[in-house]
Design a protein with these regions (language model features):
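Extended lipid/amphipathic-ligand handling interfaces
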Residues: 43, 75-81, 170-177
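An acidic-aromatic
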Residues: 63-124
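Edge/loop elements at the starts and ends of beta-strands within beta-rich repeat scaffolds
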Residues: 46-54, 69, 82-83, 151, ...
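Bacterial N-terminal signal peptides
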Residues: 9-18
Length: 220
């Protein structure tokens, strides 16, 4: 069994390309946060404040578009512990599980954005605001665009752009558990020069505020 780091804001999962309108915005310059977008960002940070930890079942369907062109399904558990510990443990052999470590980029919690990124706004459309996050530390990621629902302050989509020309994008939908908004499904696409895949993830059986040993989050 292999621990695979990912951000559930994510899971983390599962990836689908943003709408053409969102891509058009992504080509423009990001504007600084104003009073309205700052208020939305604060709501996003405060979302699910009562949740200290959770565990959930996850089912992952992958369709590789590059060699070896397989379409495996994996099951496992996703774990979260405040403030920013997240991981997925797949119920499969380490060799197979390790192949999907690259599927999920790390997603930092919104409360960490201002420390890690230069945060701006690309625009608002169809009831959603797109934030652009540019890493302050030099690395593989050029920027990350995050689409936030203005009514619920939930993240509807992520889109990473990498310096090597690769992209990772996914849309996600939510379910309500104990008054909290938690990811129920993610659908998306991974596109790197040497690795391409369509990914769908489904989450269920959330258990909130349970005890989780920190060893679960250690790389193995």
């Amino acid at each position: 069994m292999r621990n695979i780091k990912l951000s559930l804001v994510a899971f983390a999962a599962a990836l689908s390309i943003l709408s053409p309108a969102a891509h058009a915005r992504a080509e423009g310059e990001a504007a600084p946060l104003d009073a309205k977008t700052t208020a939305l960002y604060k709501r996003l940070v405060a979302l699910n404040a009562s949740i200290k930890s959770y565990k959930a079942d996850v089912h992952l369907d992958v369709a590789l578009k590059t060699f070896p062109y397989i379409s495996p399904s994996l099951d496992g558990n996703v774990y979260y512990k405040k403030p920013d510990k997240e991981t997925v443990v797949f119920d499969t052999v380490p060799a197979l599980a390790s192949q999907f470590k690259k599927v999920y980029p790390k997603v930092d919690p919104p409360g960490r954005w201002l420390a890690l990124y230069d945060v701006g706004v690309l625009g608002s459309e169809d009831g959603a605001t797109v934030f652009r996050l540019v890493p302050k530390k030099n690395g593989r990621v050029e920027h990350l665009d995050v689409r936030v629902d203005e009514a619920t302050a939930t993240i509807k989509a992520y889109a990473w752009s990498y310096k090597d020309g690769g992209t990772v994008a996914f849309d996600q939908s939510y379910t309500s558990v104990g008054g909290a908004f938690l990811v129920e499904k993610q659908i998306g696409h991974v596109d790197f020069p040497s690795y391409k895949a369509d990914v769908t993830s489904n989450f269920k059986n959330y258990k909130l505020n349970v005890a989780i040993n920190d060893k679960v989050f250690a790389d193995k």
